[in-house]
């Protein structure tokens, strides 16, 4: 089984550059605007899209992403509408990988089999489910793999050598290294330690390693890019969108343009870093 994620990372490896993985919240601040953001991301330089599934109790998310989820839910966003976004995106873009990211409760209520069927039909390539450990692979991970959808695991600085093989077992697509403990949007980790961690994980897997949590600026993204196969940016993009909204969460500026400007700057920085390192 070769997915769009596999194809994308193979292409990037051949080009000698890391991926820019961009996260935003589905339905934030509303369905129409969020879909415009999603369609604009690849044109701005995003290589992989992480599509957030808004949830009322997002335990791993910091204030910015929690607020984005709340705005989306208040605007009527549902899991079905988030899948609709993926399907609409696929009508114009059949190559950029889509990874849906969120919490298991949403999928469980929707129905695992129904969700996987609809996700595959909508053009979803991978899942990141932050509250589903490897001990529960039978719940979603293995069915997802059988459906042709990558299941992407999170590793952290506290994932020790005993735990790492369990985390990597049944992982596919890429490995998401959370560069610090805590919630999304925290301060960036020491890049030297990140590099050491990535090298350590690579001893146990051939999968690409993408690093996220705390990456906010093009300079930070470039620093991480020297050590990883991909850089994940989420909170900064969510904040760029939020900066164009009024106190009620309605657009007062141009959220799409704000997100696009940031992603373009991030993409230029990430690509230039690896090119300089390769010369």
From Swiss-Prot:
Pathway: Amino-acid biosynthesis; L-tryptophan biosynthesis; L-tryptophan from chorismate: step 5/5. GO terms for molecular function: tryptophan synthase activity. It comes from the Bacteria. Keywords: Amino-acid biosynthesis, Aromatic amino acid biosynthesis, Lyase, Tryptophan biosynthesis. Gene3D superfamilies: Aldolase class I. InterPro entries: Aldolase_TIM, RibuloseP-bd_barrel, Trp_synthase_alpha_AS, Trp_synthase_suA. PROSITE patterns: TRP_SYNTHASE_ALPHA. It is an enzyme of class 4 (lyase). It catalyses: (1S,2R)-1-C-(indol-3-yl)glycerol 3-phosphate + L-serine = D-glyceraldehyde 3-phosphate + L-tryptophan + H2O. Its EC number is 4.2.1.20. One of its GO terms (cellular component) is cytosol. The active site is at residues 50, 61. CDD domains: Tryptophan_synthase_alpha (cd04724). Tetramer of two alpha and two beta chains. Belongs to the TrpA family. HAMAP family: Trp_synth_alpha. The alpha subunit is responsible for the aldol cleavage of indoleglycerol phosphate to indole and glyceraldehyde 3-phosphate. This is Tryptophan synthase alpha chain. It comes from Brucella melitensis biotype 1 (strain ATCC 23456 / CCUG 17765 / NCTC 10094 / 16M). The gene is trpA.
């Amino acid at each position: 089984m070769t997915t769009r994620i596999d194809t994308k990372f193979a292409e990037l490896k051949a080009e000698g550059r890391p991926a820019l993985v961009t996260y935003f919240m589905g339905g934030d601040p509303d369905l129409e605007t969020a879909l415009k953001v999603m369609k604009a991301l690849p044109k701005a330089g995003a290589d992989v899209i992480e599509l957030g599934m808004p949830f009322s109790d997002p335990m791993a998310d910091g204030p910015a992403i929690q607020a984005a989820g709340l705005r989306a839910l208040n605007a009527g966003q549902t899991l079905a509408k988030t899948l609709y976004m993926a399907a609409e995106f696929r009508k114009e873009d059949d190559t950029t990988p889509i990874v849906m990211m969120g919490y298991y409760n949403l999928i469980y209520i929707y129905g695992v089999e129904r969700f996987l069927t609809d996700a595959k039909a909508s053009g979803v390539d991978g899942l990141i489910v932050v509250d589903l450990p490897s001990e529960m692979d039978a719940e979603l991970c293995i069915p997802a793999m059988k459906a042709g959808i990558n299941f992407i695991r999170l590793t952290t600085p506290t994932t020790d050598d005993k735990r790492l093989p369990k985390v990597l077992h049944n992982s596919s697509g890429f490995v998401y290294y959370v560069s610090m403990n805590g919630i999304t949007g925290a301060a960036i980790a020491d890049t030297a330690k990140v590099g050491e961690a990535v090298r350590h994980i690579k001893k146990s897997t051939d999968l690409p390693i993408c690093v996220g949590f705390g990456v906010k600026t093009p300079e930070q993204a470039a620093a991480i890019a020297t050590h990883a196969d991909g850089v994940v940016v989420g909170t900064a993009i969510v904040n760029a969108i939020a900066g164009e909204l009024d106190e009620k969460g309605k657009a007062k500026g141009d959220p799409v343009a704000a997100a696009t400007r940031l992603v373009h700057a991030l993409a230029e920085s990430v690509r230039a870093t690896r090119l300089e390192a390769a010369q």
